[in-house]
A protein has these predicted regions:
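Active-site loop/helix belt of alpha/beta enzymes
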Residues: 1-83, 149
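Charged (often Lys/Glu-rich) extended helix/loop segments that serve as interaction or gating elements
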Residues: 46, 57, 61-166
């Protein structure tokens, strides 16, 4: 709805100032990569509907930067458990990846992922809580907590889905 409103504003400005534009640049910031959120097709359907009310698609080019909404689903990031530390009764699972590898600006708080276990997880002890962390030793490098899951061991894989966008 936001990008539709921006496109509608571009139409309003073009009409108000009698502009004949060769292009309209809608910029970036398009979310994507999750089934519960819109993807680039949803955004551009709405943008196109609003812009076509005034602009001729043969004469006015739509410029957009859909980056993340296109690439985030296309890439996974595989990490390996390199150590498990028990510190004051808490389990910290250290991986060879980091939060900075997944999101350099460290703005994400949700990291969709799945596990590949080195051996059958059904025969492992169940841990009440395990924090999966990066190898930076920085406090912000805690990625997520696993509650009541099979104990992770060195060699297990944590594979992050939709990791292509930052």
């Amino acid at each position: 709805q936001v990008f539709g409103a921006l496109a509608k504003m571009a139409v309003r400005i073009a009409k108000e100032y009698h502009l004949s534009l060769s292009y309209v640049d809608m910029g970036g910031g398009y979310f994507g990569g999750r089934d519960d959120m819109p993807d680039y097709r949803d955004y551009f359907k709405e943008i196109g509907k609003e812009l076509s009310a005034h602009f001729d698609p043969q004469k006015t080019i739509l410029i957009a930067e859909p980056g993340v909404s296109l690439i985030s689903r296309a890439t996974t990031f595989e990490t390996t458990v390199i150590d498990v530390k028990d510190i004051r009764g808490r389990k910290f699972v250290v991986t060879d990846g980091s939060r900075t590898n997944l999101n350099p600006l460290v703005t994400r708080h949700l990291y969709p992922h799945h596990m590949e276990y080195l051996s059958d997880p059904s025969v492992r002890n169940t841990e009440p809580s395990q924090w999966v962390c990066g190898a930076t030793c920085m406090e912000y490098d805690k990625l997520f907590e696993i509650n009541e899951g099979p104990a992770l061991v060195p060699g297990d894989k944590v594979i992050y889905d939709t990791a292509g966008g930052y």
